[in-house]
Structures are given as C-alpha cells and as structure tokens.
Amino acid sequence: EHVHEPLIQSTLIATDNNLAFVNDLATDYGCSEDGLTWTFRIREDVMFTDGVPLTAEDVAFTINGIVNGEAAEADLSMVDAARAVDATTCEIAMKRPNNALLYTLAVVGIVPAHAYGPDYGERPIGSGRYMLEQWDRGQQVILRANPDYYGDAPLMDRVVVLFMEEDASLAAAQSGTADVAYTSAALAGAVPAGYTLLNCA
C-alpha cells in the first residue's frame, strides 16, 4: 500500500532513462579516494510539504534510520553512519567501499526528522512532486501536485492510485477507466489497444 511514497518523497540522486545518475536533492557529490567517505551537497531551495526546509540533517536522519534498523526500506548494510556537516552537506561513512551505494540512494526517499514517527506512513510529509490528499486504506490513495516542488511541475495535477488485484487492474485498463495498470508477464499479451507495455523489471 505504500506504492505512492516515491511520488511524495525526494531522493538524493535519481537515474535517467539510460540508468545514468542525475542529481535530485543533491547538487554535487563525491567519494574519497579510499571509498570510505561520500560527501553530498544538498539543494537550499527545498521545502517539505509542511513548510519546513529540507536540510542535510534530514538526509542523515533518513540514512541512519535505515542503518539502525528503524526503517527497512533499503539495504544500507555497507554504511556505518551519516552525519550533517552543515545545513547543506551530508557525509556518509562506509564500513567498506561499495559500488551499489548510489543505486540504493536513488530509491531512498528522504523523510523529515522533525515529523517522522510511527504514523508517518498514514500521514507522510515529503518534498516530492506530489502530496497526500486522501488515503482510503486498502482501496486507494489520492495525490495532488505539490505547488512548492523545486523541480519541473508534474504533468498531472492529481493522481489516484487504486489498489486492486492484477485481473481487475487489467480489466480497468481494458475498459478505459485506468490510465496506467500493472500486469505480469503472463498477461502481457492482453495489453489493450492504446496502451504501451513497459518492462519495469
């Protein structure tokens, strides 16, 4: 049910269509020669949807939460700890060099240190393209465009994510009531006219 969170949260870096790394929250980053210290510079123009600025403290908080087992979002077992050097600089100390770190950071959504708690999943605050408007548990999530998003404006003002079984999802696409639907390879031959099949493996 948390499929919507990548739309709500921003990441340090992202990957483009060619899987090359591009900056998101980071404006610059680099690694020490021994591969044990990564330094990320963070944008200064990013706000969470509650109006609080996003800083390197939030980045360190998010990474340390995963490292310490408080969030099981990604495998950061190669990381020792993260720390905010100042408001716009975060250092990540590694246990050992690891070339998968950037790929992992490209999917780790940064959460607000000041507002993260047990009920965060129900009322997420992020800095991404969208913000939560409504969540009907087990049925749907309604998102609306974040007017303060720092990047290019989203192409859709509103997104409704319906939670349904694969057959129902395909039927919704076939009837024209869904713009996007997930299906497995077994049903790939049933893609309705006007839709494009994307391999997201």
Region annotations inferred by a language model:
Residues 1-33, 64, 125:
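N-terminal lobe/hinge region of extracytoplasmic solute-binding protein
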Residues 13, 17, 47, 64-71, ...:
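Sec-exported extracytoplasmic/periplasmic mature domains
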Residues 16, 20, 97, 103-154, ...:
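Gly/Pro-rich hinge or "lid" segments in bacterial periplasmic/extracellular proteins
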Residues 17-18, 34-35, 43-45, 59, ...:
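Solvent-exposed coil/turn segments that connect beta secondary-structure elements
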Residues 28-70, 91, 172:
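Aromatic- and charge-enriched surface segment that lines or borders ligand/interaction sites
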Residues 34-37, 41, 74-115, 134:
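Surface-exposed binding/hinge segments that line
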Residues 76, 189-200:
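Ligand-binding "clamshell"
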Residues 118, 147-191:
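Ligand-site clamp/hinge motif
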